[in-house]
Swiss-Prot record:
It comes from Ureaplasma parvum serovar 3 (strain ATCC 700970). Keywords: Cell membrane, Membrane, Transmembrane, Transmembrane helix. This is Uncharacterized protein UU007. The lineage of its organism: Bacteria, Bacillati, Mycoplasmatota, Mycoplasmoidales, Mycoplasmoidaceae. GO terms for cellular component: plasma membrane. It is a multi-pass membrane protein. It is found in: Cell membrane. Signal peptide: none annotated. The keyword Transferase does not apply. InterPro entries: PQ-loop_rpt (IPR006603). The chain crosses the membrane at residues 42-62, 80-100, 131-151. Pfam families: PQ-loop (PF04193). To U.parvum UU008, UU041 and UU042. It comes from the Bacteria.
Amino acid sequence: MLNILNNVSNSSLYSAASNATAQTGSNLINDLVPETLTASGISIAISVFSVIGTIVIALSVLPQTIKTLREKDTASLSLLLFLLNGIATAFLTLYGIGLVTVHPNSFSFLVDIKNGMFIYNREEWVAGYLICGIFLIMGEALCSVTSFIVLFCKVNNMIKAKKMGMSEEEYYEKQIKPFLKVKGAN
């Protein structure tokens, strides 16, 4: 244990920082970020796949949300699908917040960005937690909000139809469709 502490205190990390102004950017990164902290190829691949998956999930409900807001037709939509999708993506948003905030370097990352300081984008926590977490927060929050918008429209139409003693489809045909100014709705 004492040997490890001596190696840390005598590491070239601290001496490299004092000579940082005289070095090129590439050498500076190699000296300041030890090889043990750099992201592995598998970490980067996992991050890329999770970001792609997050973007696809985030955009999956958007077309239906736009169509529902334009046409107000919710009769053929599944209430349970949008409820479960909204809840699941809300929890994934919380998971993204956890990924970003759980690592001790997260606070220093935010402070360094605010102060315009150099960010070590090759570190494991950036590839494994930060990038994935930021995309999860943005993407899944979008998906959750759009799912709950469609769910709200569906429940609203169901309640109004029930008050009038109609099915949701009849309510749409008699109360909503005649007043829509959407091309193809009438």
